[in-house]
Amino acid sequence: HGLLFDSKKFNLLMQDEKIDIIVWVTRGYSNAIRNPEMYGWVDTNGNQIKKVSVKKPLKNPCTDPLVIGTFTFKSAEMFKNSADRLIKRDYRVNGELYVDSCINDAVSLGYRCIIFEVDHYLCWGTPNELRTFEYWQSCFHKWESHPYSWDKDKWAFPKDRNPPTSLSKLELNDI
């Protein structure tokens, strides 16, 4: 995924010794609104996390904090303790273990977990989201006055594949 965030605000959270774990979130992401059962959701009191719900929306997918898959544990030990507890209780969602779920274990262990809301979020975690990103990447490359160019991008579209040339190649109901 790609995102824009306030680095000064993040640095202040990192310097706060009362905070142990930061869960990065966004709100109102269109694909999560359409498919809330595909995402993790955070129940909070202010910015403090009460619980994380994986694959089960809370109250309102339009406004509830959405886990974007970025977590900041201030120490490896905090992650290990939380993950070990999750594994020991064998808490799985659809047969899988999720870092999202391990935040509930961190809360139970007494770690102070807070959310950090990003300013803008772009996901390419599903095939259609990736194709949409590739389409716009191709457009910006072809736009002569745009600063983006595949030649300057080490993560550019693979040379052995052709990028999409129109939105019609996407499943428009998933955009």
Show where each model-derived region lies.
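Catalytic-core segments of class I nucleotidyltransferases/pyrophosphorylases
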Residues: 47-122, 128-150
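Intrinsic disorder/low-complexity segments enriched in polar/small residues
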Residues: 16-18, 135, 170-172
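Short N-terminal helix-initiation segments at or just after the protein's N-terminus
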Residues: 10-15, 51, 149-154
